[in-house]
Amino acid sequence: MNKGNLIENYAVALFNNAMVDNIQDKIFEEITSINRIITDNFDIREFLFSPIVNKNDKINAVNLLAKNIKISTIVQNFLLLLVKNSRTASLSNIVDAYNTLLYESKNIKIVQVISANKLQPKEQEWIKSLIEKELNQKTEILFDIDSTIIGGIVIKYDSMLQDYSIKGSLEKITKALKTVNVAA
């Protein structure tokens, strides 16, 4: 089984478990919070991701963490399953896949917008409204910054890429110039 399917399977299992009690949003908040704690804390991350650390010690750590931050039994059992199956290092990817499932269940499309500089709130709202009008669907926009695009924006969703950046335009011009046959 490839890693993408494995991650998706874990996310779907967690999502389906959450659907039983209609707590998909609550589970997302909890699993995102846990992921942030693990990601932000080097010692916890190394402890949980290390193949050298005994699984029983990891299980005890997850149980202690669950007790201290008061997470649901569903999330606690899910984390224990990841520990038992040596999949804790995949947690961030599982959270991303769960997020996608959550938005799909609400008929909301996740769209990534990349700009060279931080966009002002008015600009973000304007871009969001244009994208929602084009897609005829509600969206969750993830705004990212990549100074290498020089200017403009790049829009990504599903398998689509719309490049309105200066870098993209320059690359298209360069490619076009390379195809021109100039006789000497």
Curated annotation (Swiss-Prot):
It is a peripheral membrane protein. The keyword Secreted does not apply. One of its GO terms (cellular component) is proton-transporting ATP synthase complex. Keywords: ATP synthesis, Cell inner membrane, Cell membrane, CF(1), Hydrogen ion transport, Ion transport, Membrane, Transport. It is found in: Cell inner membrane. SUPFAM superfamilies: N-terminal domain of the delta subunit of the F1F0-ATP synthase. Gene3D superfamilies: N-terminal domain of the delta subunit of the F1F0-ATP synthase. It comes from the Bacteria. InterPro entries: ATP_synth_OSCP/delta_N_sf (IPR026015), ATPase_OSCP/dsu (IPR000711). GO terms for molecular function: proton-transporting ATP synthase activity, rotational mechanism. Belongs to the ATPase delta chain family. F-type ATPases have 2 components, F(1) - the catalytic core - and F(0) - the membrane proton channel. F(1) has five subunits: alpha(3), beta(3), gamma(1), delta(1), epsilon(1). F(0) has three main subunits: a(1), b(2) and c(10-14). The alpha and beta chains form an alternating ring which encloses part of the gamma chain. F(1) is attached to F(0) by a central stalk formed by the gamma and epsilon chains, while a peripheral stalk is formed by the delta and b chains. F(1)F(0) ATP synthase produces ATP from ADP in the presence of a proton or sodium gradient. F-type ATPases consist of two structural domains, F(1) containing the extramembraneous catalytic core and F(0) containing the membrane proton channel, linked together by a central stalk and a peripheral stalk. During catalysis, ATP synthesis in the catalytic domain of F(1) is coupled via a rotary mechanism of the central stalk subunits to proton translocation. This is ATP synthase subunit delta. It comes from Rickettsia massiliae (strain Mtu5).
